[in-house]
From Swiss-Prot:
Keywords: Cytoplasm, GTPase activation, Phosphoprotein. The modification Phosphothreonine is found at residue 49. The gene is RAP1GAP2. Residues 32-53, 509-533, 552-730 are annotated as: Disordered. This is Rap1 GTPase-activating protein 2. The lineage of its organism: Eukaryota, Metazoa, Chordata, Craniata, Vertebrata. One of its GO terms (molecular function) is GTPase activator activity. Isoform 1 and isoform 2 are expressed in platelets with isoform 2 being the predominant form. Expressed in lymphocytes, heart, testis and pancreas. Residues 618-631 have a biased composition (Basic and acidic residues).
Length: 730
């Protein structure tokens, strides 16, 4: 039996001899010594016989490292140190090392480019400014070949279309928004061209298309699609307004700026802080000479030219400033030393509020001193032109120029020469003013200013489109209503509501006409709450004792004028009066006596079952009348045989009525009613030979002039009723 001992290991090898473990340690040590990494950089892994706590702790450390790597990968970009952004040392370190100093130093965290032939920080992808240069024909010998950069589309309409034969079109509500297109045919060197300007809310496109090889001119939608692939299925309308050209040229040139304001900051030797720059009050002779080169020193009080935001009335922004005109443009300079100085204000806000709101500024350096673009905190300053005088005090001093701007600002001309040194004279002034003007135009293309410009362009384009459309329709003699129906527009909620009301009124009138024709012999059921008519005709009978006679008159037309349920008739009669102004039915108040004795009759007004009926009584209390008769009791008349007469049919219903003494009416002057009993067969009292049917006859004030008083008719008929009842009893 072998006497070799074995040791237990928690590694992945199970049972391992100690001799084998020792040999593994030796090999691992040799590998560690042979590698380039040092022991602290590359620690040895724990031995295979290490306790589990030691291996688990290293395992968790490895997990933490892996999680840290994953978190770094999930970040938008690698976190760089300040040294990764600084191509030069900080300005304090540069000043401590001593001169000569560079003119411009990139800020610690970047964000700017420097135009310098020897500097790799100048952006090369942009190449040149996106602004188009003016035509060379406009350049004079005094410009020294320096061109002003501006948007060619802004002046194209005035240069090529205004005052010449051309056509304008507008498109409403496309996927690209409102569009306005101008087209003109022209010929150059024997070749025909089609010059087109297409305006959208995003941009304005100006192109010249050759027509060689085309059998006919392309249509306006085809021209629009040639400029933009998304312009599909568009419908253009011609602009028919004599003054449309002036409106279009005003829109195109809203981006053209003929007034500029630039800041001028005086930087002395070894000044590296914003407070130090704005705190300078003295002007050196070299700085005064430079200001004289820029323009004329003017007095602000009552100044009539472009003031650039300075006070010309109360003198709150200083006494003097520098002003000049350049190629039909006005320029006002905000000179830091000429703006008001406030004692005790380290930031000098009276100066910074003007220079800080400028877009381009000049940094004049008295001596060789570095400048950092982020030295001045401002949201508007996007470009700086640094000018350093090299030979001050001489008759023709020289100036060294450097240009820096933010990264989102495209490059602008004229380019700096190599070396960038100019002699004092008209050429340097021409270069400097041209560079300043082009710098501001280029800064307007940066992200911050471009968003503002896009919103302004879209609003102005929509306004121009609406005005052209309105004037075109006015020239055609089309109003807003005709224009909407012509274009198929619904006109909004209000127009839809008006049309619905008109259709409803027309349908109501048609229904009323049909009701009159179908119910010419009786009462319309819709007016009495939907009550069905009996087969027998409505009769009107006078009492002639002792024999009851009925005279039947056929009506040639309906006695009821149907009124719309939307506008029920208003009752203005007083509620306190005792006269009944509603349809009433006679009801027996006491049971009939066997011997045919006296019975009292109570007549109560009933409310119609139709709430929209025009004859509804507004009184809640039911007025009643009691009639004592010696004759037989009058049975309650059926509602199916009751008839209602309105003001429209009253004339025919009252033709055979007996006339009585006229009495003043106590009812409302707007409506008068007559209560008439006409005997007719009743289904409820078959034993009686005749039953009294009450009839409500309404009278209007107009009919009362030619008719007898309804109150007298009521009294006369009640007298006849009493006389007939007494005669039958005897």
């Amino acid at each position: 039996m072998f006497g070799r001992k074995r040791s237990v290991s928690f590694g992945g090898f199970g049972w391992i001899d100690k001799t084998m473990l020792a040999s593994l340690k030796v090999k691992k040590q040799e590998l560690a010594n042979s590698s380039d990494a040092t022991l602290p950089d590359r620690p040895l892994s724990p031995p295979l016989t290490a306790p589990p706590t030691m291996k688990s702790s290293e395992f968790f450390e490895m997990l933490e490292k892996m999680q840290g790597i994953k978190l770094e990968e999930q970040k938008p970009g690698p976190q760089k140190n300040k040294d990764d952004y600084i191509p030069y040392p900080s300005i304090d370190e540069v000043v401590e090392k001593g001169g000569p100093y560079p003119q411009v130093i990139l800020p610690q965290f970047g964000g700017y480019w420097i135009e310098d032939p020897e500097n790799v920080g100048t952006p090369t992808s942009l190449g040149s400014s996106i602004c188009e240069e003016e035509e060379e024909d406009n350049l004079s010998p005094n410009t020294f070949g320096y061109k002003l950069e501006c948007k060619g589309e802004a002046r194209a309409y005035r240069r090529h279309f205004l005052g010449k034969d051309h056509l304008n079109f507008y498109c409403t509500g496309s996927s690209l928004g409102n569009l306005i297109l101008s087209v003109k045919c022209e010929e150059a060197e024997g070749i025909e061209y089609l010059r087109v300007i297409l305006r959208s809310k995003l941009k304005t496109v100006h192109e010249r298309i050759p027509l060689a090889g085309l059998s006919k001119l392309p249509s306006v939608p085809q021209i629009a699609k040639a400029f933009c692939d998304d312009a599909v299925g568009l419908r253009f309308n011609p602009v028919l307004y004599p003054k449309a050209s002036q409106m279009i040229v005003s829109y195109d040139e809203h981006e053209v700026n003929n007034t500029f304001k630039f800041g001028v900051i005086y930087q002395k030797a070894r000044q590296t802080l914003e407070e130090e720059l704005f705190g300078n009050n003295e002007e050196s002779p070299a700085f005064k000479e430079f200001l004289d080169l820029l323009g004329d020193t003017i007095t602000l009080q009552d100044f009539k030219g472009f003031r650039g935001g300075l006070d010309v009335t109360h003198g709150q922004t200083g006494v003097e400033s520098v002003y000049t005109t350049f190629r039909d443009r006005e320029i006002m300079f905000h000179v830091s030393t000429k703006l008001p100085f406030t004692d005790g204000d380290a930031q000098q806000l009276q100066r910074k509020r003007h220079i800080g709101n400028d877009i381009v500024a000049i940094i004049f350096q008295e001596e060789n001193t570095p400048f950092v673009p982020d030295m001045i905190a401002s949201n508007f300053l996007h470009a700086y032109i640094v000018v350093q005088v090299e030979t001050p005090g001489t008759e023709t001093p020289s100036y060294k120029v450097s240009v820096t701007a933010r990264e989102d600002v495209p490059t602008f001309g004229p380019p700096l020469p190599s070396p960038p040194v100019f002699q004092k004279g008209p050429e340097f002034r021409e270069f400097l003013l041209t560079k300043l003007t082009n710098a501001e135009n280029a800064c307007c293309k940066s992200d911050k200013f471009a968003k503002l410009e896009d919103r302004t362009r879209a609003a102005l384009l929509d306004n121009l489109h609406d005005e052209l459309h309105a004037h075109t329709q006015a020239m055609l003699g089309l109003g807003p209503e005709e224009d909407k129906f012509e274009n198929g527009g619904h006109g909004g909620f209000l127009e839809s509501f008006k049309r619905a009301i008109r259709v409803r009124s027309h349908s109501m009138e048609t229904m009323v006409g049909g009701q009159k024709k179908s119910h010419s012999g009786g009462i319309p059921g819709s007016l009495s709450g939907g009550i069905s008519h009996n087969s027998m005709e409505v009769t009107k009978t006078t009492f002639s004792p002792p024999v009851v006679a009925a005279t039947v008159k056929n009506q040639s037309r309906s006695p009821i004028k149907r009124r719309s349920g939307l506008f029920p008739r208003l009752h203005t009669g007083s509620e306190g009066q005792g006269d009944s102004r509603a349809r009433c039915d006679s009801t027996s108040s006491t049971p009939k006596t066997p011997d045919g004795g006296h019975s009292s009759q109570e007549i109560k007004s009933e409310t119609s079952s139709n709430p929209s009926s025009p004859e509804i009584c507004p009184n809640k209390e039911k007025p009643f009348m009691k009639l004592k008769e010696n004759g037989r009791a009058i049975s309650r008349s059926s509602s199916s045989t009751s008839s209602v007469s309105s003001t429209a049919g009253e004339g025919e219903a009252m033709e055979e009525g007996d006339s009585g003494g006229s009495q003043p009416s106590t009812t409302s002057p707007f409506k008068q009613e007559v209560f008439v009993y006409s005997p007719s067969p009743s289904s409820e009292s078959p034993s009686l030979g005749a039953a009294a049917t009450p009839i409500i006859m309404s009278r209007s004030p107009t009919d009362a002039k030619s008719r007898n008083s309804p109150r007298s008719n009521l009294k006369f008929r009640f007298d006849k009723l009493s006389h007939a009842s007494s005669g039958a009893g005897h």
